[in-house]
Design a protein with these regions (language model features):
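Feature detects amphipathic, helix-rich regulatory segments
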Residues: 1-224
Length: 224
């Protein structure tokens, strides 16, 4: 992002047809914190993984670590809501922010910050924005790791002061679409690579089996 006279935000590389500077808005100008608490009507608990995004707790832990007695104070999460998890890791040094793409309601621990976004910002654009480290500097300046070394500490009021770089909606949509297609292409090639790698491993085991006895010899018959 190049900074022009007057501190206008103008990206050095952008789609053709767009010349206006990007705006910098605070998160609370485009999003609102969810304050709705569960009334024990929603039974499914979600978790926010830095690697896998928002997933059902049953899928992530192989069992539900909550029960009806302790989820009454949990926050309700709706489809397309965003969730900040203060748990830090190597790939999420100040905690991950992910979007609920499960297509259903759930509840999450009150340790998480849940927020919905307005129509002034494209949800997919914001999702990719939070996959970058553009917002990390603000977090490191305004928050800290707290008493627990695995938790990032920042107040809600400060969190929602986070600056967000916002082009016009049409440009947001193009940026989001571009990265979405890129992700799909990467996934496709990863699957092809895994398929080729598995085939090569099979060939190697068969060749080894033809040259020796024992387990590799038995493997040859399994792979046929």
């Amino acid at each position: 992002m190049a900074e022009q006279p007057g501190k206008a935000l103008v990206p050095e590389i952008r789609f053709s047809g767009f010349t206006d500077p990007w705006e910098q808005r605070k998160l609370d100008e485009v999003a609102s914190k969810r304050i709705e608490k569960n009334t024990n009507e929603i039974k499914e608990t979600f978790t926010n993984s830095a690697e896998h995004g928002i997933v059902s707790q049953l899928d992530y832990f192989d069992h539900d670590i909550t029960n009806d007695a302790n989820i009454g104070n949990y926050s309700v999460v709706y489809p397309d809501d965003f969730v900040y998890n203060p748990r830090i890791s190597t790939i999420a040094p100040c905690g991950p922010i992910n979007r609920n793409k499960l297509g259903r309601n759930g509840v999450m621990s009150p340790l998480y910050t849940v927020f919905s976004v307005d129509d002034v910002i494209n949800k997919l654009y914001l999702e990719y924005y939070f996959k970058t480290n553009s917002w990390h500097q603000f977090m490191f300046l305004e928050g800290n790791s707290g008493a627990r070394s695995d938790r990032f500490s920042i107040s809600d009021s400060t969190f929602f002061e986070m600056p967000i770089q916002c082009p016009v909606l049409e440009e947001q949509e193009l940026i989001a679409s571009f990265f979405n297609r890129l992700d799909s292409l990467i996934t496709l090639h990863q699957r092809k690579y895994c398929g080729v790698a598995s085939w090569m491993l099979g060939v190697a085991l068969v060749r080894l089996g033809s040259e020796s006895d024992g387990a590799f010899g038995e493997m040859k018959h399994v792979l046929r």
